[in-house]
From Swiss-Prot:
Protein name listed in UniProt: Small ribosomal subunit protein uS3
SMART domains linked to this entry: KH
NCBIfam families in UniProt: rpsC_bact
Assembly and oligomerization: Part of the 30S ribosomal subunit. Forms a tight complex with proteins S10 and S14.
Sample GO molecular function, one term: rRNA binding
Membrane-spanning intervals of the chain: none
Gene3D superfamilies: 3.30.300.20, Ribosomal protein S3, C-terminal domain (3.30.1140.32)
Record keyword Metal-binding present: no
Length: 220
């Protein structure tokens, strides 16, 4: 099972935290659980499409009664903030239009993009779109992650690799990636490369350390 599903599915509350922090049992329109889920999807969709080149690692959403806090973790905060914060203000106003609520936007820098699965996947996808050989792009992703000190990394590509007539998948693995060990802190990322031959899916699993709620294996 651990090999087939999204690794976050079984690890929420163990090594992985939720990316949406709110609760609703209201029956009032606009405050129902389904309304909040729909709003979250719209917020994430808008930001990921608009900030495609900003290296977005993850987006966290927290709600109060009449306010939404959105934390954007990015490898390129300058693109999101803009000159004197002009771009950040524009995104915040657009989110307020989408949600009809007051929005607090926080931009946080990702210190180690080489060890963040989604950013590694995006880097490989950008190389594929620039017509770099897929095996070379995969090896570069492996080398940058292992040199940054991760315990293991697995990269899987699927699609018309190298412009082949028939689509196929190929993966490389370096070190340990124990997907069935729930105490293993596994970071997972997915990105699609848009190539002249069609889309190629890029999946990355990064094994950082074994832990349970902040306690490392063998530690006190």
């Amino acid at each position: 099972m651990g090999q087939k599903i999204n690794p976050y599915g079984l690890r929420l509350g163990i090594t992985t935290d939720h990316v949406s922090h709110w609760y609703s049992d209201s029956t009032r329109p606009g405050q129902r659980y389904a309304d909040y889920v729909s709003e979250d999807i719209k917020i994430r969709s808008y930001l990921t499409k608009t900030l495609d080149r900003a290296g977005i690692a993850r987006i966290e959403i927290e709600r109060t009664r009449d306010r939404i806090r959105v934390d954007i973790y990015t490898a390129r905060p300058g693109i999101v903030i803009g000159r004197r914060g002009a771009e950040a203000d524009r995104y915040r106003l657009e989110l307020e239009k989408i949600t009809s609520k007051q929005v607090q936007l926080n931009i946080l820098e990702v210190k180690n993009p080489e060890t963040t699965a989604r950013l590694v996947a995006q880097g490989i996808a950008e190389q594929l779109a620039a017509r770099v050989a897929f095996r070379r792009a995969m090896r570069k992703g492996l080398q940058s992650a292992t040199s940054a000190g991760v315990r293991g990394i697995r990269i899987r590509l699927a699609g018309r690799l190298g412009g082949a007539e028939i689509s196929r998948s190929e993966f490389y693995i370096e070190g340990q990636v124990p997907l069935q060990t729930l105490r293993a802190s596994i970071d997972y990322g997915f990105y699609e490369a848009r190539t002249p031959y069609g889309h190629i899916g890029v999946k990355v699993w990064i094994y950082k350390k074994p832990s349970v709620r902040g306690r490392t294996e063998g530690g006190g």
